[in-house]
Regions:
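N-terminal organelle transit peptides
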Residues: 1-4
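Short secondary-structure boundary/capping segments
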Residues: 9-10, 88
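Local sequence-structure signature of Cys/Sec-based thiol-disulfide redox active-site neighborhoods
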Residues: 10-46
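Acidic beta-strand-to-loop metal/phosphate-binding motif
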Residues: 20, 73-77
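Thiol-based oxidoreductase modules, predominantly thioredoxin-like and allied folds used
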Residues: 45-60
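Thiol/disulfide oxidoreductase modules built on the thioredoxin-like
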Residues: 64-70
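Non-catalytic, surface beta->alpha helical segment in thiol-disulfide oxidoreductase systems
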Residues: 76-105
Length: 106
């Protein structure tokens, strides 16, 4: 596994909830990242974010790691949940809140 993939694997496995996004939750740099980060904040569980705009290797590497072509990408307990559409569907159904609560042991 190359160093970028190893770094991503470490990030995903050492944090229960990780959002790979453009920008930060307070200053998102794209509408899709903004929507997902707002949904996560509304769920009330702490989450880690990685700003892919700060590291081109991570920005391209996360697409390979998750076999998912777009950003944002949400990982919960080491597994890719999906991008904006899937995350928003889960949020609107109430399933995201349950998933995140279980991930942090609540």
């Amino acid at each position: 596994m190359d160093p970028v993939q190893q770094k991503i694997k470490q990030q995903v496995e050492s944090n229960p909830i990780v959002l790979y996004m453009k920008g930060s939750p307070d200053f998102p740099q794209c509408g899709f990242s903004m929507r997902v980060s707002q949904a996560l904040k509304a769920c009330g569980q702490p989450f880690t974010h990685v700003n892919v705009l700060e590291d081109a290797d991570i920005r391209e590497g996360i697409k390979v790691y998750g076999n998912w072509p777009t950003i944002p990408q949400l990982y919960v307990k080491g597994q890719l949940v999906g991008g904006c559409d899937i995350t928003m569907d889960l949020y609107e159904s109430g399933d995201l809140q349950k998933m995140l609560q279980e991930a942090v042991g609540g």
